[in-house]
């Protein structure tokens, strides 16, 4: 999965004009004389797309009644534009689970309840967090297709050279280790022990979702109201982050990051030794194996707030969601494929082995087909930790998080003079956005 930003609500609002003209197919598959051609849109590309196509090819070979075409490098904008035009593919998937509130709330993805009921799908096979980010207000328009959890990657050689014997467990330890591991040359950064910069790769996505479970921080209360200003955890996190940015020097950090390679390439800053530690998703294990198998590294849960040692082992969780778009011409055949991809142990284990994402059902996580890997095992544990959390699902989709990201970028640049007042203003913006979108959502 890849984190992307942007808002879908304005685009999907335009779909209403065609909604009445489109009728959802029944949950009863009909016999067809000729193979039904299914088109599947996914966000994966390159190596990961090849792995997905391999999984689909197995299904295709066993089901002569369908012929499946997989299209990669798809994003949410392309999906919503296709739905709006009335010519969507048969199956769609998205890396942005936070947008499920928009997809379910607007009806852009159809309700899967009739299919789930017909085939007696036991939803308890999916962990609680995955069930949460594939529905909105009880309407389930998606299912999880593998999952992501975030943890700490660290360079073992750099740790040994700095005399650090084990990965940090608290943010105080993380700060101390980051400073020990940092290397400078001629006043410029050569190696950053830990880069806290909001927007630096997926781990430090600016909306802070990957840090919220580490500080027991919540975005919304039980009524769906934003509470960033009233929760001390957010101020504590932001002040920690700004202090470490200032220690490096904001301008120096910006110049240093200008030399980073693309996140999803062999030039990734951690992979080439420019970062000693980094928060990242489990997929990095596969990238490292393919691009830098010689690198000696370790994985661990992310450190946690010193005041909450009980949270150690938890982390941020999200994942790819898959569903059937409104207006799809073959919903029954599309559902059969979605069901296979999301519930078949072999399919999930094979795909997990290929791209090293977390299997999204309890049984597939224990499948004999799943290849063991000690670095990957860290993320399986994080995914199943009861304190792990995901982003809040609201009618506004990812738009709330976009607002948060804009604020944190200003904060780290020193453009927010009063943190509490700034967070209060942010809360008002989020509440207004949710109200306009049709209501808030549970935290």
List PLM regions with ranges.
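Short helix-initiation/N-cap motifs at beta->coil->alpha
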Residues: 71-79, 171-176, 254-268
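Long, aromatic- and glycine/proline-rich binding clefts that accommodate carbohydrate-like moieties
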Residues: 129, 293, 352-406, 410, ...
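Paired acidic/hydrophobic, glycine-rich loop segments that form the ligand-binding mouth/hinge
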Residues: 90-94, 276-280, 298
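Extracytoplasmic/periplasmic substrate-recognition and gating elements
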Residues: 61, 162, 247, 289-356
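Hinge/lid segment of periplasmic solute-binding proteins
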Residues: 97-149, 190, 212, 369-372
